[in-house]
Amino acid sequence: MTKGSVGKTLAWSGAVALSLGLAMAQAPAASAQMTAQAMMDRAEIEDLLARYYWNFGGGGAAFGSFYAPDAEMVLGKNSYKGAAAIEGAYKAVPADAPQRKSFSLNILPTNILIVVHGATATAQLVFTETVVDKQGDPPRLLTQGREFDHLVKLKGRWLISKRQILGPNAKPDDWPK
């Protein structure tokens, strides 16, 4: 073997070993077996969350329609139980709040982690709210936080059963480790 071919062989061996190591490594949240059904459920949940956040920009659906009938939304120290109470919480946001009086509001969900457990699931994400105050203005950051959701599949449809909205560096005490 030449010096160059030994180097190439070592490089390929290292790449294969690294690839195998990465393939065999297990992320903590990915420990649940990923079946075809779980992948479809995960896609449905991701779509539910995307539609939920799209709704803030005038998507039209009632916020309560994303929740199970007996759902709970925890926002800071306030808790709203039932789809009607959750809908009411959104309607109660004052007209002079930046989210309401701005030209546009966009909420960007990122770092979405969804784990499906049959007919239940959990989802956690980071949300970033941006507003454009007047047409032509640059967007500005309004707030950022974390969301932790418990979901349930009812009559073939994924719905939020509990939604906890927290600050940018918080985690609920009852959240799975």
Please report, for each region that a protein language model flagged, where it lies by residue.
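N-terminal secretory signal peptides that target proteins for export/translocation
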Residues: M1-G7
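Bacterial N-terminal signal peptides
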Residues: W12-A23
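Short, low-complexity N-terminal intrinsically disordered segments enriched in polar/charged residues
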Residues: P28-A61, S65
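Transmembrane beta-barrel outer-membrane domains
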Residues: A43, S102-L105, R140-L142
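A solvent-exposed, acidic/Ser-Thr-rich amphipathic alpha-helical stretch
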Residues: G60-F127
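Short, surface-exposed coil-to-beta transition loops
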Residues: I107-P109, L142-E147
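Short beta-strand edge/turn micro-motifs at domain boundaries
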Residues: T122-Q124, Q144-D174
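Beta-strand elements of well-folded, non-transmembrane domains
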Residues: E129-D133, L151
